[in-house]
């Protein structure tokens, strides 16, 4: 593996960037009537318009060449054939296999991948259908009406995002809720709405040792037992998504009601596995299969389309262009679709936990920027919160806008305004508004020339600010599957270019190691352990507030 900055394509991009410093997208559109057609791409019903970027066709050729020299195609094939590309944990990365309708024969760690996936999916389907048709009943014989998914990180963010996004497709009589935070108000607020006799809990923890998940699960069990007063009730009101049968059984869950997943499925890529049980319970098995099919359609596109016409590659390489040549630190994601209100938190984990790394595959510190800060909110809420910064701030912020052509509610006029606002924002970012135009408008409105000159600079929109637009027909399960897989593969592309491991997450470990002694120090008779001055001071203040000695 050659160092990234020594690759010929990288050096060519450095030279090309010098000629692009003053590139004006407005002029590019004036000079090229076909720019939209040239710099847009379709996959199924999904349209990516990337023409509003500071790129030319030459830029895109250089970026595709960088992908080739970085051996992106080889790494993509290695992932899909079960090689251990998660090299720090010596694991394969096979979330793509979970959504393939026909899986090639593949053995990983002595496990027949196709057979194992098929077996778990079959068990999931039977369970989902038993809840929906009423044959699975609670301890007192009542059917299940509410499901509470207890998990954190990938066991929560993905399923919660999908369930909110596809709420229009929810089955009747079963509602799914999500609890993740260790803060007791999260669980208490959820349980306050529910009837223990008709509530099912899903405990999602691969090891069945995750602190936050087990704390919430034990509290939920205590709530259930306080109401039903029968220890055997746990078996009818709890199921587990785990690999630790012994711990699951000790909790009181029948191991027959444990759905497994594997080390080659990372948490932030796990909604396609048994972790997606809550999704299937919310939208039904057929719609869950449509979600998988949409993701598979994007997988096929990613594996087969040439780099120059490959949607995840284009999105990923545009991110490289801005982060490593234009010096951007963030990118904004703005879904003009309220159902996608949890997409940004999901993408924050997907992107920042995957590519927030500073050591490369050669175990060396990198000398370039890697994962960006991901942020955003649904439109039009974001317009009234932070778009001032995007339009008029001092930082260049690449952005993604997502919007459906057709809404699923009867309020069609509101959707027309939503669509109009989405397109207007991307146009405003591109075109901007000059001081001369603003002065003329102010004078025409009756303002004096001097006052107009004084106010105009504050109303200037510089324009020439980049954005991508992802347009889809409607937000159905298949389309959502495509969108999620698109961003998964985009993150993979960038990790390959940056020569980092996108599939481990060591950054979460240190805080977890430091928490137990701090917890002990907060409530013990005497302060235990040594801490830095700031942490020691905070512990002492908490102890004083609790009436403990310091």
From Swiss-Prot:
A biological-process GO annotation: glycolytic process
Record keyword Cytoplasm present: yes
Coiled-coil portions: none
Q: Which SUPFAM superfamilies match?
A: SIS domain (SSF53697)
Q: What is its EC number?
A: 5.3.1.9
The answer on whether this UniProt entry bears the keyword Cell membrane reads no
Q: Which GO terms describe its cellular component?
A: cytosol
Pathway, according to UniProt?
A: Carbohydrate biosynthesis; gluconeogenesis; Carbohydrate degradation; glycolysis; D-glyceraldehyde 3-phosphate and glycerone phosphate from D-glucose: step 2/4
Active-site residue list: 353, 384, 512
The UniProt catalytic activity note for this protein reads: alpha-D-glucose 6-phosphate = beta-D-fructose 6-phosphate
What does the sequence similarity comment in the record state about its family? Belongs to the GPI family.
Q: Per its record, how is this protein called by name?
A: Glucose-6-phosphate isomerase 1
């Amino acid at each position: 593996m050659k160092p990234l900055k020594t690759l010929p394509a990288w050096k060519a991009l450095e030279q090309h960037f010098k000629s692009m410093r003053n590139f004006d997208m407005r002029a590019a559109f004036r000079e090229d009537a076909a720019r939209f057609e040239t710099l847009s791409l379709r996959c199924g019903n999904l349209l990516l318009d990337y023409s509003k970027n500071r790129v030319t066709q030459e830029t895109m050729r250089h970026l595709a060449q960088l992908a080739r020299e970085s051996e992106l195609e080889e790494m993509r094939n290695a992932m899909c054939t079960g090689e251990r590309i998660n090299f720090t944990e010596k694991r394969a990365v096979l979330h793509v296999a979970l959504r393939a309708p026909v899986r090639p024969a593949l053995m990983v760690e002595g496990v027949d991948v196709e057979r194992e996936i098929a077996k778990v999916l079959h068990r999931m389907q039977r369970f989902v259908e038993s809840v929906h048709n009423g044959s699975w009943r609670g301890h007192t014989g009542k059917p299940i009406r509410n499901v509470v998914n207890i998990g954190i990180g990938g066991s929560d963010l993905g399923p919660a995002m999908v369930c909110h996004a596809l709420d229009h497709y929810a089955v009747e009589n079963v509602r799914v809720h999500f609890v993740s935070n260790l803060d007791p108000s999260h669980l208490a607020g959820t349980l306050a709405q529910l009837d223990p006799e008709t509530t099912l809990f899903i405990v999602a923890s691969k090891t069945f040792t995750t602190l936050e998940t087990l704390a919430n699960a034990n509290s939920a069990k205590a709530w259930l037992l306080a109401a039903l007063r029968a220890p055997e009730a746990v078996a009818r009101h709890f199921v587990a998504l785990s690999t630790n049968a012994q711990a699951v059984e000790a909790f009181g869950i029948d191991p027959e009601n444990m759905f497994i997943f594997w080390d080659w499925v990372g948490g932030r890529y796990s909604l396609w596995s048994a972790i997606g049980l809550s999704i299937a319970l919310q939208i039904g098995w057929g719609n869950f299969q449509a979600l998988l099919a949409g993701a598979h359609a994007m997988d096929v596109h990613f594996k087969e389309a040439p780099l120059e016409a490959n949607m995840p590659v284009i999105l990923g390489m545009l991110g490289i262009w801005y982060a490593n040549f234009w010096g951007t630190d963030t990118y904004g994601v703005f879904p003009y679709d309220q159902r996608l209100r949890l997409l940004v938190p999901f993408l924050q984990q997907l992107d920042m936990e995957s590519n927030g790394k500073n050591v490369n595959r050669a175990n060396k510190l990198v000398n370039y920027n890697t994962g960006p800060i991901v942020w955003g909110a649904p439109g039009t809420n974001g317009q009234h919160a932070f778009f001032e910064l995007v339009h008029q701030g001092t930082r260049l912020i690449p952005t993604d806008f997502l919007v459906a052509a057709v809404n699923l509610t009867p309020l069609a006029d509101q959707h027309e305004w939503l669509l109009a606002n989405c397109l207007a924002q991307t146009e405003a970012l591109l075109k901007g508004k000059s001081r001369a135009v603003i002065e003329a408008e102010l004078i025409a409105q009756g303002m004096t020339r001097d006052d107009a000159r004084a106010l105009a600079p504050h109303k200037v929109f510089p324009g020439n600010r980049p954005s991508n637009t992802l347009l889809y027909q409607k937000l159905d399960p298949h389309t959502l599957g495509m969108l999620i897989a698109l961003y998964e593969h985009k993150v993979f592309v960038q990790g390959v270019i940056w020569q980092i491991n996108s599939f481990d997450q060591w950054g979460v470990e240190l805080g977890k190691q430091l928490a137990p002694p701090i917890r002990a120090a907060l409530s013990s008779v005497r302060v235990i352990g040594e801490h830095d001055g700031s942490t020691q001071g905070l512990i002492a203040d908490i102890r004083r507030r609790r009436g403990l000695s310091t």
